[in-house]
């Protein structure tokens, strides 16, 4: 909610002809600046699909801004067919007003990391020799508990490395780990420099992403570019990101 008047004045002053809102929103009343066309990129409608994960205030604000942007934009870019379907379903936007453009990931992941560099990274973060990897904020929606529970049925030498910003959800994981005696087989990392992530990906045996809902799923692309197998969840957009060469579970 930046100064609406200030943005409108800037658009006119700089002779802007196209405004692109990069993440679910546009400046309010931009539709009144008739000489400026607008495009908005919508990443997801998680605040509607999984409303219980958001406070009432956040839901109202996110929904107001996104609904306004979708209604008044001259065109909408959705990052997946899943997001496009949600925009049509929740906001009644005509399908021909929406284009799907998939996201990409850094080219770093397609470059093979040398053996010495991988060893250095594994030693630096005290990573186990064999591990399953998952990357993403450690929150309920990402469903990391499903992976932790699966460890009980996997060989003891296979560990789980979870890279992501922790939230209160991490306490649920640790509680289950303690009860199941899995504390030594689960490793939490966060704040990892982007230069080290390719080595962490390429040293993993597989990448698992059981998220309940995503707008797209860039970590899946990072894993595929890293050359490791991917297991992901169904029922959102992950099959679009992973394609036919990944495995899916429900």
Model-derived features with residue positions:
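Carbohydrate transferase catalytic cores enriched for Leloir-type hexosyltransferases
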Residues: 1-250
């Amino acid at each position: 909610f930046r100064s609406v008047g200030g943005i409108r004045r800037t658009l006119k002053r700089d002779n802007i002809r196209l405004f692109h809102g990069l993440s679910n929103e546009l400046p309010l009343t931009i539709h009144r600046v008739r000489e400026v066309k607008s495009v908005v990129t919508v990443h997801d409608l998680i605040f509607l699909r999984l409303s219980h994960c958001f406070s009432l205030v956040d839901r109202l604000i996110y929904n107001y801004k996104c609904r306004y942007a979708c209604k008044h934009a001259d065109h909408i870019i959705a990052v997946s067919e899943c997001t496009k379907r949600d925009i049509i379903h929740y906001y009644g936007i005509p399908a021909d007003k929406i284009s799907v453009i998939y996201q990409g990931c850094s080219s770093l992941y397609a470059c093979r990391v040398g053996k010495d560099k991988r060893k250095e990274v594994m030693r630096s973060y005290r990573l186990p020799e064999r591990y399953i990897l998952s990357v993403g904020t450690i929150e309920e929606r990402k469903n990391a508990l499903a992976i932790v529970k699966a460890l009980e049925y996997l060989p003891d030498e296979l560990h789980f490395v979870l890279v992501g910003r922790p939230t209160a959800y991490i306490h649920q994981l640790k509680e289950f780990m303690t009860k199941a005696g899995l504390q030594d087989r689960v490793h939490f990392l966060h704040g990892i420099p982007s230069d080290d992530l390719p080595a962490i990906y390429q040293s993993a045996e597989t990448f698992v992403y059981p998220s309940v809902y995503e707008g797209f799923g860039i970590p899946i692309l990072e894993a595929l570019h890293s050359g490791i197998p991917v297991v992901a969840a169904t029922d959102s957009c992950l099959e679009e990101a992973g394609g036919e060469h990944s495995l899916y579970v429900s």
